Each structure stands twice: as structure tokens, then as C-alpha cells.
Amino acid sequence: YNQVLKGMKAYVNAKGDEHSEEFLKQFKYSPMSINNAFNSYLEKRNNYESLVSKEESEKFLAANAKKDGVKVTESGLQYEIIEQGGEVMPTLSDTLYVKYKGTLIDGTVFDQTAEDGEPISFPLGGVIKGWQEGLQLIGEGGKIKLYIPADLAYGERGNQGIKPNSALVFDVELVKVGKASEEK
């Protein structure tokens, strides 16, 4: 698309004002109608990908819920506690220090902390709902595998490399809980 636009602009610069009637008569389709058609195509493609992703995610979660060791909450979050962790339990107002790996349901890694690196920190109340709910199930030092439905992740909008309506899988180690009362 960018190459087509670049070519059209070069042609415009060589032939005159792109808004003049004389210039527009040279084209079977106006640049505006081409742009509108392209945007319509993108919207239809995104809607199709969203529907396919939703169907695949629902199928994955339905099969996954039947696996031994997988528990399902009322919200639809699925999880496996690998290690329960200690007595210090996180709340939404706490800052958590975690190591994690996030994958799509096909196993494609879309984000992770460095394997030998430092954990990242974030306020629990500021992350996706699947993490908010799931990480409150383990204590400091615990490990959990989260299978997050799209509505508890990025929903219909998707996010950087994650298609709309995608279920996500996370392996998370809760390294430390920074209690809100201790941070003030």
C-alpha cells in the first residue's frame, strides 16, 4: 500500500494538483476511493481474523478445561498451581515482582522476561484481569500457569502481535510481593 501511495504522490507531483478536476479525470478510480476500498478490506480482514481467533480460543479452552490439574474459576480463568508459594498473598493494591512467559495458544511466545534476568515489577491492579485474578491465587515464591480467555486479556482489541479475541497462556513465577502498606 505504501508503495502505491508513494507512486501516486510522485505522479501527482509530476502532473499537478491532486484535487484538480483535470488531474482526477486521468484515473478510473480516485485516490480517495482507492483509500476507502483499502480501509474496507483491512476492516473485513480484521473482523475475519477476530472471528477465527475467537473460535480457536474457545475450542482450546474447552479442551484444556478437561485436563487433569486444570481448575476453572467462575470468570472462566483456567489455571494450574505449580507451587503455592508462601504466606504473603498479593492484593490489587500491591506491586508484584514476577518472571513470566506469555504464549499464544499455538505456543508462539509473544512476551517474556529474560530467563536469567531480573523480574519485572508492576501494580497488580494495572494489568489484565486474568493476571489480577490468577496471581491472587498464589503466595510470594509461587508459580502458576494461567490460561486466560480473551475477555480477561485483551478482548476484541488485541495487542501488539496478539490478535483480537485471543486466549493467552502464561507461566508466571511470583518472585516478590511489595505490599502497598510497606511502600509508603
Language-model region placement:
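Cross-family detector of peptidyl-prolyl cis-trans isomerase
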Residues: 1-184
